[in-house]
Swiss-Prot record:
During L2 and L3 stages, strong constitutive expression is seen in the ring gland. Lower expression is detected in specific neurons of the central nervous system (CNS) (at protein level). Disulfide bonds: none annotated. The gene is Hr4. It is found in: Nucleus. This is Hormone receptor 4. GO terms for molecular function: estrogen response element binding; nuclear receptor activity; zinc ion binding. The keyword DNA-binding applies. Residues 30-50, 145-327, 380-587, 672-820, 887-913, 1015-1101, 1142-1210, 1341-1371 are annotated as: Disordered. InterPro entries: NHR-like_dom_sf, Nucl_hrmn_rcpt_lig-bd, Nuclear_hormone_rcpt_NR3, Nuclear_hrmn_rcpt, Znf_hrmn_rcpt, Znf_NHR/GATA. It comes from the Eukaryota. A zinc finger (NR C4-type) spans 921-941, 957-976. It comes from Drosophila melanogaster. GO terms for cellular component: chromatin; cytoplasm; nucleus.
Length: 1518
């Protein structure tokens, strides 16, 4: 009864096992000959193995950085470093951890970190070793915690970004009498206030605080360090500049050439630095001397083995093998011999004396800036030397050891007081020396950033941090004078911090004269005094291997950098002066790590990274800081976009497995700079590689190209059909749409965080080039999105730079200059020519649709159309503008969609002469043959798209997903070719799935396409005639020209009315909306037109609308005469194919699209009230005409919403046929089998009577209670036979019942025998979960009210009220989501667990603990209960249940999809009568529970306890 909780398949487990075996061999070969091997991996957290396997990290490591309290049991016999995330966030008061030494003389070092939030304490992760327990508790403000000897950890609810560090270093010997317990404590909070910890903790706190700009240097406490063989490896900056406050691992000391096993995971999103350290104790070295290698320095990270250390992306794993590595903090390497040496009290005294001498020797050196963390290796040899925990705390031996420890502490206390006094003197000296050093700083050499002389600095820093936190081990018996001393230290720290704050303010005043724009940004920044962003110079920028890969692209930027070199150096000088203000002893490194990604140029390009891609973790780590650093609607919009972006990675499985990231920190999982600066959440930072933003800033080519500039790719390892594949994802640069100079000062004012002067100059220079090259829309975005202001923090700063929304956005005062004038001609041309632009335009303009994440084709074929461009989700792509407008709020395309009408009233576009020049394929630019699947393509791309969709092929790209697709190389990358097909607007639903030829000549979709194609050609001819006339009439005004053009087009359609009524309505509706889109594109979001222009546009639109309504009335009469009425039509006819009751059916759109369209509609109504001038009678007839003739809003989206302003909201986006083609409301649940709109046999609507008959047949054959329950359950429980025999009987019963049910189904004869067997094999657990949940939802309330049971057991039996109890609680509305703390949910889960406990105790014949039960089936019971409650709240009906059951049975079976579609139509027809107000919403609500049912069913399979549903149902009726 053990629940396997690993999220991986058997193949993954096998590879995991192989990884562990390899590690075991390597570690055993490196360890001593004690015979110890690696701990049993089933009892240890997988995070504790280093170097971490990518597969290994998902299961256990996600808890390390959650805001919740997650005690991780650390199995101590691990001969390697214990890597856990470390954090040193910004302003904080150190809430030190309280360590209680248990009586067995073994103490595991516990480090606790405080998390983000205003004064929040973080998660404490306790390390429990083989010996006694260690208790740590983090403290919130003004709350004192007492230490206990049990494993405990408390966390603050506000610490959502906290990362916890746990490092165990037990130091004890079997006969040691004077062991100073080693404990490591480093706690820090990330808040904007000064204090986050409680200062008044009696005998449990060591006070180490800092003010708002200096973070606490509360480093690590460990056993007294040896003074012998102390080596210091100074920082060796290569190329000069710091490389980001990353985490580094040093291999030094007595480690003789072995590869370092120290791995530091720095996964947190803090405000200014990501410092962390790790250390590795070498296995038993041959020398008897202990060695301590301390490495400190500025965060220049130059690993020699090629492993990058990066903190800015939120995650870094660095493994170094050379002592040349330098870290942001400090890493101490201690050998195991040192620990053995410390176990003897006489040697302890020697160490104390040596340490005193060494401290006095280096007392004059300056203190280092950054606090570090120490992670000490726990080896089996040290575990062996520890005594076992005592049986009783009151035993005599433990009391004697305690007394001996007290005597040691008394001796150490005097030394500590002297060291504290020395330390205070050192601080004063360091302040004065650092102030003197400020005047000597020069700007250009970045190597001078390492503070002072490095050699003695390192050693003294190490002892300074030890002395700072040394009283932590003595606080249990320390006198009150110790606390007075600590408070005086704290007061001194605050004074120093205030002094630093003052100096920093003076420095910024000096900057204000020379850099007013930068000062202006700092005034807007909430943390302007904290963040100092250091931009590396030109020499540093080219050290990245990504530059070596893309060196041709760098030549443009080298010229650009040379022009700005002097200004950069001046900026460097001031920034370095600011930097040295913050290198005081209590100040952390406040440099911006996202811009300092210096790497070793010799390393390989592809290095295995491990990322925790759990999205709830990303949201928890990011959103509090988002709400903290920006206010109001900007933060809310940015948060919404951030949450929306991360949806597809919530349970992300790229082509089959959870992703592993290679070569990049998976920037598309973490929102960076979500456009909050302009008040709109639609601009997303396109940089896919935030950790190397200094390198990706160079990757934007200045020349026009077919594809956007390639950023540093993020490679995701995936698995498809057992084959390892790579998915190269990148985030698209949103089009800047040719911004002018007037926009940049505004963006600079609104950017809340530091954009350096250099980047502002790059923006302005970039905007000049964008004005010169008007067709290049996504030009400089990689440069504008670089200043992610904090390492991994989700900030709503407009670090997107030039990528602001210039139309279609949500709010944000944008000037009229933000409308791109060069896009208007192109937009109008796109509108009239259905996306067929000029050849030269297509070659110079990158397509705006780039899916922000890798296109997951498996999920696409499974029905997840959320990856498609928004235009595909709205209509049949009848105009190209609808895609751009519809996506302006989601993909940052406002510059294209919004700028479409700004110049139309001033300078009309010249019609194209496409009939004279050949059509060009929109995919590969080959000669096109016509309109295929929605766009103009060649035969090759048409066939490629058709075969891909019909065969559901899954492609992968070996590059970064942006391969150029041309005629010459279109066959090189199928993934990018198909992706471009989707982006350009080819419609998946238009592909015939039955593989029948003759698609052009039959079917509604193809009729529609033929009409569209004819309209396209005739419109071009008419435009040419008009162009010839207009060239002769140049004196006419531009507004009159627009009106004449519309009038002439309408006259043309009136002439064609009798010949082609259907064509007339398509064309007329399209052109009328085109007129309104020309006149009203910018009225609602930004009032960019003058009042006179608005009035004129409204008048023209109203006239066109009135004329359109008259034509509709005439057309209705003609339709009635020609066709003999509406109701008698054949269903397969395109136009009036709908019955009267279906005329009121809403289109099938997702709620998000409906909401977006309603908002746009309301905005247009408010902006132009002239649009709704028609009478109610005309409005009603227009609605009917829209249903019958399919002309309204084929463009869809907000652009056409003005024309349909008088329509009901559910009809805004067009007709039922068109929405049935895209059917976005069922996207998540239905597979990609929407040929119901293509095949005429599936177009027929099922009548309500017929649907009721089919549903009743299902109800008659459905033995719900027989399947859901066990007959004679009481006898079953009391049966004394073998448990295995009982379970076999249950299994046989399941099989028999399901086979009997399927044989009664009306479509049983249509199912082949092998498919029938496969169905039962694959779907039995899903059907069982659905039946269980529906049974309890349908029958539980009746039993709960009656109180009795069917088998006569009394109502007082506890087993008879599990479903009746929660019904007394108030039931929320069905729309309300079910939370884990919902009283009904909690009550029902507890009732189910108690029922299971009772029944299983009876069944097994032995008591079963509730904890064990929760561990085994708790998660599954939660899921089942959640489904039950949701079914109960939405008042599930029996008719809906049987349809859902058939749907689940037939789901994902290609051969049976026609049957499945038939019953979906049956359910839809039933819902149109049972829920006439909103049947589609009801259908979506029902289908939305299918993924939850599948998840619960998978848990049921994993637990192997398939009898749980039977037990619950049977016990509830017993």
């Amino acid at each position: 009864m053990t629940l396997s909780r690993g999220p991986y398949s058997e193949l993954d487990k096998m590879s995991l096992f192989q990884d562990l075996k390899l590690k075991r061999r390597k570690i055993d070969s490196r360890c001593s000959s004690d015979g110890e091997s690696i701990a049993d991996t089933s009892t240890s957290s997988p995070d504790l193995l280093a170097p971490m396997s990518p597969k290994l990290c998902d299961s256990g490591s996600a808890g390390a950085s959650l805001g919740a309290s997650l005690p991780l049991p650390l199995a101590l016999p691990l001969p390697m470093a214990l890597p856990l995330p470390m954090s040193l966030p910004l302003p904080l008061t150190a809430a030190s951890s309280a360590v209680t030494v248990s009586l067995a003389a073994v103490v595991a070092a516990v480090a606790e970190t405080g998390g983000a939030g205003a004064g929040g304490a973080g998660t404490a992760v306790t390390a429990s070793g083989a010996g006694p327990c260690v208790s740590t508790s983090s403290t919130t403000a003004a709350a004192a915690t007492s230490s206990t000897s049990s494993l405990s950890s408390s966390s603050s609810s506000s610490s959502s970004t906290s990362s916890s560090t746990s490092s165990a270093s037990p130091t004890a010997g079997a006969s040691s009498t004077a062991t100073c317990p080693a404990s490591s404590s480093s706690s820090s909070g990330n808040g904007s206030g000064g204090k986050s910890g409680s200062i008044k903790q009696e005998h449990t706190e060591i006070h180490s605080s800092s003010s708002a700009i200096s973070a606490a240097a509360a480093s690590t406490v460990m056993s007294p360090p040896p003074a012998e063989a102390t080596r210091s490896s100074p920082a060796t900056p290569e190329g000069g500049g710091p490389a980001g406050d990353g985490s580094g691992a040093t291999g030094g000391g007595n480690t003789s050439g072995g590869s370092t096993a120290g791995v530091a995971i720095n996964e947190h999103q803090n405000n200014g630095n990501g410092s962390g350290g790790s250390s590795r104790a070498s296995p038993d070295s041959l020398e008897e001397k202990p060695s301590t290698t301390t490495t400190t320095g500025r965060p220049t990270l130059t690993p020699t083995n090629g492993v990058l250390s990066s903190a800015s992306a939120g995650t870094g794993i660095s493994t170094g093998s050379s002592a040349k590595l330098s870290e942001a903090g400090m890493s101490v390497i201690r050998s195991v011999k040192e620990e053995r040496l410390l176990n003897v009290s006489s040697k302890m005294l020697v160490f104390h004396q040596q340490r005193e001498q060494e401290t006095k020797a280096v007392a004059a050196a300056a203190a280092a800036a950054a606090a570090g963390h120490v992670t000490v290796l726990v080896t089996p040899s040290r575990i062996k030397s520890e005594p076992p925990p005592p049986a009783s705390p009151s035993s005599t031996s433990s009391t004697q050891r305690e007394r001996e420890r007290e005597r040691d502490r008394e001796r150490d206390r005097e030394r500590e007081r002297e060291r504290d006094r020395d330390r205070e003197r050192e601080r004063e000296q360091s302040i004065s020396s650092s102030q003197q050093h400020l005047s000597r700083v020069s700007a250009s050499p970045p190597t001078q950033l390492s503070h002072g002389s490095l050699g003695p600095n390192i050693v003294q820093t190490h002892h300074l941090h030890q002395q700072l936190t040394q009283p932590l081990t003595l606080r249990k018996s320390s006198p009150p004078t110790e606390h007075l001393l600590s408070q005086s230290m704290q007061h001194l720290t605050q004074q120093q911090a205030i002094h630093l704050h003052h100096l920093l303010g003076q420095q910024q005043q000096q900057q204000q004269a020379s850099h007013p724009q930068q000062q202006q940004q700092q005034q807007h920044s909430p943390h302007s005094l904290v963040r100092v962003k250091k931009e590396p110079n030109v020499g540093q920028r080219h050290l990245s291997p990504h530059h070596q890969q893309q060196s041709p692209l760098l030549q443009h930027h080298q010229q650009q950098q040379q022009q700005q070199q002097q200004q950069q150096q001046h900026l460097h000088q001031q920034q370095q002066q600011q930097q040295h203000h913050q290198q005081q002893p209590q100040a952390l490194a406040l440099m911006h790590p996202a811009s300092l990604a210096l790497r070793n140029s010799n390393r390989d390009a592809a290095i295995l990274f491990r990322v925790k891609s759990e999205v709830h973790q990303q949201v928890a780590a990011g959103l509090p800081h988002l709400m903290q650093s920006a206010g109001g609607a900007a933060a809310a919009a940015a948060a919404a976009v951030a949450a929306q972006r991360m949806v597809c990675f919530s349970n992300a499985r790229i082509n089959g497995v959870k992703p592993e990231v290679i070569g990049g920190p998976l920037g598309n999982l973490r929102p960076v700079g979500v456009g909050g600066g302009n008040g709109s959440g639609s601009v997303q930072c396109p940089s896919p590689h935030p950790s190397s933003s200094s390198s990706s800033s160079q990757l934007s080519p200045q020349t026009p190209s077919q594809t956007p500039p390639r950023g540093t790719p993020t490679v995701i390892m995936g698995e498809s059909c057992g084959v390892r594949t790579m998915v190269w994802g990148y985030e698209p640069p949103p089009p800047s749409a040719g911004q002018s100079h007037g926009q940049h000062p505004q963006q600079q004012q609104q950017s809340p965080h530091h954009q350096p002067q250099q980047q502002q100059q790059q923006q302005q220079q970039q905007s000049q080039q964008q004005q010169q090259q008007q067709q290049q829309q996504s030009l400089g975005q990689q440069q504008h999105c670089l200043s992610s202001p904090s390492a991994g923090s989700l900030t709503p700063s407009s670090s997107s730079g030039g990528g602001s929304v210039s139309g279609g956005g949500v709010g944000g005062p944008l000037t009229p200059s933000s409308v791109a004038p060069q896009n208007n001609e192109e937009a109008a041309q796109l509108l009239l020519s259905l996306g067929q632009t000029r050849i030269q335009d297509m070659r110079s303009r990158p397509h705006p649709f780039r899916t922000p994440h890798a296109l997951n084709m498996e999920r696409l074929w499974a029905g997840d159309y959320s990856q498609l461009p928004p235009g595909q989700l709205q209509a049949l792509n009848l105009s190209a503008q609808q895609q751009q407008w519809g996506s302006s709020n989601s993909t940052g395309l406002g510059g294209v969609g919004g700028g479409m009408g700004g110049r139309n009233l001033e300078a009309p576009h010249e019609p194209t002469d496409e009939d004279e020049q050949p059509l060009v394929c929109m995919i590969c630019e080959d000669k096109a043959t016509g309109l295929h699947y929605g766009i103009i393509t060649c035969e090759g791309c048409k066939g490629f798209f058709k075969r891909t969709v019909q065969n559901r092929r899954v492609y992968t790209c070996v590059a970064d997903g942006t391969c150029e697709i041309t005629k010459a190389q279109r066959n090189r990358c199928q993934y990018c070719r198909f992706k471009k097909c989707i982006e350009q607007g080819m419609v998946l639903q238009a592909v015939r799935e039955d593989r029948m030829p003759g698609g052009r000549n039959s079917g509604a979709v193809y009729n529609l396409y033929k009409v569209k194609y004819k309209k396209h050609k005739k419109t071009n001819q008419k435009q040419q005639q008009q162009a010839a006339q207009q060239q002769q009439q140049q004196a006419a005004a531009q507004q009159q020209h627009q009106q004449q053009q519309q009038h002439q087009q309408h006259q043309q359609h009136q002439q064609q009315q009798l010949h082609s009524p259907l064509h007339h309505h398509h064309h007329q509706g399209h052109q009328s909306h085109h007129a309104q889109q020309q006149h009203h594109p910018q009225l609602s979001p930004h009032h960019l037109l003058s009042p006179q222009q608005q009035q004129l546009a409204a008048a023209v639109a109203a006239a066109a609308q009135h004329q359109q309504q008259q034509q509709q009335q005439q057309q209705q009469q003609q339709q009635a005469k020609l066709m003999g009425g509406v109701v008698d039509m054949k269903p397969m006819f395109l136009g009036p194919a709908l019955k009267p009751e279906l005329l009121q059916a809403p289109p099938m759109h997702s709620p998000a699209q409906q909401q977006q369209q309603q908002q746009q509609q309301q905005q247009q109504q408010q902006a132009s009230p002239h649009l709704s001038l028609s009478s109610p009678h005309q409005q009603q007839q227009q609605q009917q005409g829209q249903h019958q003739n399919h002309h309204q809003q084929q463009g869809g989206g907000g652009g056409g919403a003005g024309g349909g302003a008088q329509l009901p909201p559910h009809l805004v986006n067009g007709t039922i046929l068109k929405t049935a083609l895209t059917n976005p409301s069922e996207i998540v649940h239905l597979r990609h089998r929407l040929d119901s709109a293509v095949s005429s046999s599936k177009d027929r609507q099922i009548s309500y009577e017929h649907a009721l008959g089919m549903i009743q047949t299902l109800i008659d054959c459905d033995a719900m209670e027989d399947i859901a329950t066990l007959p004679h359950f009481s006898e079953f429980l009391e049966d004394k036979s073998e448990i295995s025999e009982k379970l076999c009987n249950i299994g046989d019963s399941i099989v028999h019942k399901l086979v009997s049910w399927t044989k009664k189904l009306p479509f049983y004869l249509e199912i082949p025998v092998e498919i029938h067997t496969k169905l039962l094999t694959d779907k039995w657990h899903e059907i069982l979960i659905l039946t269980t949940a529906a049974y309890q939802a349908l029958h539980g309330k009746r039993r709960g009210e009656g109180g009795g049971s069917r088998h006569g057991s009394p109502a007082s039996t506890p087993l008879s009220t599990p479903t009746g109890t929660p019904l007394s609680t108030p039931i929320p509305s069905p729309a309300q989501p079910l939370h884990k703390d919902d009283p009904e949910f909690v009550s029902e889960v507890n009732s189910h667990l108690s029922t299971l406990q009772t029944c299983l105790t009876t069944l097994m014949g032995q008591p079963i603990a509730m904890e064990q039960l929760k561990l085994d089936v708790g998660h599954m019971v939660d899921k089942m209960t959640q489904i039950t409650i949701m079914f109960r709240r939405i008042k599930l009906k029996m008719e809906e249940y049987v349809c859902l059951k058939v749907y689940i049975l037939l789901n994902k079976e290609v051969e049976l999809e026609s049957i499945q579609e038939r019953y979906v139509q049956v359910l839809r027809s039933y819902l149109q009568n049972s829920s006439p107000q909103n049947p589609q919403a009801r259908l979506s609500e029902l289908l939305s529970h299918i993924p939850e049912i599948q998840a619960a069913a998978s848990l049921l399979l994993e637990s192997k306890m398939f009898y749980v549903p039977f037990v619950l149902n049977s016990a509830s009726i017993r």
